[in-house]
Amino acid sequence: MTSRVRNYDLHLVIVFMSLAAAVIGSFGVASALIAKVDSISIEMLMIRPDALGNYMNSSFAVVFNLSLLASGSCFLLAMVAVFNIFPDLISRYIAVLGGVVGISIVLMGVFPINFLELHRKVSTLYLLSSLVLHSICLVDYFKPGSTMTKRMLTLSIISLCSGFVLLMLLDWSQLDFSECSADFPQYCVVSLSMWSLTQANILWCVCLGLSLLKTIRTQQNNLYKLI
């Protein structure tokens, strides 16, 4: 029994670390967002997520930034486990790029929007690495024996759509986005795309953990049947 459990140690690292990244990230974002607004409404989505880490006007900025540090670290550990479990080239690319995403999330917690120049660089790194990561996930889905689920594929497509919108709106000279329209402040494409990318990545982490958990149970059941 000990040897069987040990065989799945790295799988369990992926399960727990990816779920932890999603839970911690969701808690930090939700608590900072609720503390910033007077009431829960659709207008919450017009607030850029990175503004929640501003120490000058966000009362829960510390919680938000610490959650980025913790969730990014958890996701990085999950990707280290992916790199060591799956030896094929595509999975290794996913692990490396996922590691870059994790590091960029950590750096966004270390350098929130108050450190504007550094924050712009690390947030651009997050955007680009997320785009490349989900592009490779699309390829991985059609690989024989892939553990990528349809839900993960759907979330990757959503992330790509949101990411490409942000990429088109990005001012490369400043590595930042233009302010929302003063005429139609209720329709801020930048904020909506940021929230869409953020939530898709969080749910992608959840699906990754649940997918590996299902794989463990299936393989264990097959092993017991053989015995």
PLM features: residue spans?
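Interfacial helix-start motif at the membrane-water boundary
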Residues: 50-73
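Short, Lys/Arg-rich, polar N-terminal cytosolic tail immediately upstream
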Residues: 1-10
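Terminal transmembrane helical module of multi-pass membrane proteins
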Residues: 137-227
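Membrane-proximal helix-loop-helix units in multi-pass membrane proteins
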Residues: 97-148
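Internal transmembrane alpha-helix with an interfacial aromatic "cap," most often the third helix
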Residues: 4, 66-97, 137-145, 209
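C-terminal ends of transmembrane alpha-helices
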Residues: 27-34, 103-117, 162-182
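Hydrophobic cores of alpha-helical transmembrane segments in multi-pass inner/ER membrane proteins
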Residues: 22, 67-77, 128-137, 196-211
